[in-house]
């Protein structure tokens, strides 16, 4: 899978071109007969999106997601409320623009020449490639040449249809495919892993997130190079909304907010390990139910699933784990650390988890207040792994190399330098295994994403099964019937959504909805 990168050069070029084209519309506040004025008079920004792990999602009634968070900030920027409409597929999104039911599409849509003929793009904010996926263990095609409509299905309105048509005309005349008008890319990927479909095409970011929950989904080949992702608005001669978006993205880019939001949702990396993910999810089923009460009991300010991910990274949930360096137990504490925390038996799971949380809280308390709230945990975890003094060195090195010491995205890139003599020889606390701290935090983020998504998938499946059973037993409530027939519903039920501060969930919804956000 290609490494994700934020295309700031593309943003800059597009911003310059938009500025020239939109100059007559600036300033755009105060005019009474333009799109921005209409939005402000209405008091709400109407945004259409789709339900995916990255763009928009909800847990315990709280919305989140990369596109949602950016759209909410844009609505705040305009001084209006955000009204979100969730559609089932991309075709329905563009129908909303065509019919005047949306001001903006914020759904991880790819910029391409066909779309910009009819719709106005915003500055772009990340990039993806389109990839063909299949189920592990099934035939992996090495080319598109022989694929037929019986094998390949894509979502309606998918940008890749234009690419497929070009490939058919220029390279693969036998290529054919089917468009499923009722399903989006996420549902088609589900069909692939369930054996209902041979192949589909989705973007690289969506695939990477999907694999955290369904490691049996594999990438066969790349269909396109990286393509910039953008929002779309109507192309009708009124450029005031585009001018506002230009100003908004420029401001977000300049003050570092855009980079922080991207780090929050895209910063977990795209390196996928099938065996490791499968092993982890098996442990979720086999081991986690016994440990969950302890994680919930001691998690306190952090989400218990994040604590579980930390413990798995430390010991694979093995209370007897021991390393050659002498650290032991569920949270792999050193003897000195354990003594300072009053732990008498490092191999006692409850003592280890309790002590590990207290040690992590100590690291959290030392993180400077200038670090954004949703990034403090990553600084603390790096300090937990390599020591707080070395975290101070990493921040100092980041500042010396013209990075932002309060940005995890900037600091984590300097962590591997702590083991390189030209750098550590000039630092206060010297050599550190910074590359290990980098991998440590990244792995925890991946495990947390997998855990949250996997538990939600299980809960969704159990709820659907309970609802089906309720049709046969109408006198019994679906909830009680579900708990009776599926006892693990009690294990899956959640009472907290604190993890929203740190990472996106992976619930794939099939239903459209509409809501307002203040």
Curated annotation (Swiss-Prot):
Source domain of life: Bacteria
Enzyme active site: 314
GO CC entries: cell outer membrane
PROSITE patterns cross-referenced by the UniProt entry: TRANSGLYCOSYLASE
GO MF, one example: peptidoglycan lytic transglycosylase activity
One Pfam family it belongs to: SLT
Cleaved signal peptide residues: 1-21
This enzyme's EC code(s): 4.2.2.n1
Membrane topology: Peripheral membrane protein
CDD domains linked: MLTF-like (cd13403), PBP2_YfhD_N (cd01009)
Catalytic activity: Exolytic cleavage of the (1->4)-beta-glycosidic linkage between N-acetylmuramic acid (MurNAc) and N-acetylglucosamine (GlcNAc) residues in peptidoglycan, from either the reducing or the non-reducing ends of the peptidoglycan chains, with concomitant formation of a 1,6-anhydrobond in the MurNAc residue
Region (Non-LT domain): 22-269
Subcellular location: Cell outer membrane
Residue span of region LT domain: 270-518
Alphabetized HAMAP family for the sequence: MltF
UniProt remark on domains: The N-terminal domain does not have lytic activity and probably modulates enzymatic activity. The C-terminal domain is the catalytic active domain.
Family the UniProt entry places it in: In the N-terminal section; belongs to the bacterial solute-binding protein 3 family. In the C-terminal section; belongs to the transglycosylase Slt family.
NCBIfam families on file: PRK10859.1
Protein name: Membrane-bound lytic murein transglycosylase F
Source organism of the structure: Shigella flexneri serotype 5b (strain 8401)
